[in-house]
Amino acid sequence: SQQIRLLERECGARVLDRTPTGAVLTAAGKVLADAAERIEDELTTVRRELADLDDSIPSGVVRVGSFASAVRALLLPLLSSLATTSPELEVIVEEAEERNALPRLRRGELDLVLMERDEHTLPAAPRGMADIPLLDESWLVVVPAEQAAPSTLADLARATWIDLAPGTAGAFALDRLERQLGVPLTTRHVAYDYDVVLAMVSQGLGCALLPELAVYSGLVPDELSVVRLPGLGVRQLVVRHRSTRTEPGPATRAVLEALLSQAQGIELG
């Protein structure tokens, strides 16, 4: 076409190879196509930054990565609230494991990531990031209904436990409980999803240590009992965001403020 010929004259190279079945990009054409994509990405970023300068009414898309119990207890009510109070904001929730979500936050694919920690063991945020504590919630013991409910921490030493996947807050909490009791705990079965853990307990496969939101944000099966004991510690929920000269932008700040308000309104214990 005329536009292609003009482009080839301006860059001094052939960008398309014509074949009987069509046309394909030459090496020079691929370089130009890649450059065009990068320029379009830069323009998108510039448009976003220019829009962020007008923060009188925050608007735009905010992508939030989170684990399941926080999605149910925090983010779903937040979406409902923002739809009424801030319709200019579009919050997109993605259920994601922390190990997958954090690299995406750094790449700009997510704007906020919710994280969980046993007690207050979160190290300082890496450069270019910032962490905001949302809430602390108690760890609870979940016991099969036919089993006698524990009344002290010492009773837990004789229980059979369902372990949580390595690296999760639940796994760290169970390890901490083992150190507190001073005896090795008997574990059987391992799960990552708290709903799976609840199902295992309801089948009589063992006891589990779960945080309040994981227990009460869904339906608690009748086949189990929930016990609160002093000394079990807390799970801390934290939200991480990029922290640079231009971030977080007005839309992300607005969602952060709404998320903090939502967390403060949750009644625990």
Predicted ranges, named:
Residues 116, 151-153, 157-181, 248-257, ...:
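Secondary-structure junction motif
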Residues 10-11, 32-54:
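Alpha-helical linker/hinge and terminal dimerization helices associated
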Residues 66, 97-102, 106-110, 116, ...:
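Hydrophobic hinge/microswitch elements
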Residues 123-133, 137, 195-245:
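Beta-alpha-beta core module
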Residues 126-166:
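Flexible hinge/capping segments at coil-to-helix
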Residues 5-25:
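A short LG(V/I)-centered, amphipathic sequence patch enriched
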Residues 59-122:
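Central regulatory/effector-binding core of bacterial HTH transcription factors
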Residues 74, 148-149, 225-269:
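A late-sequence structural motif
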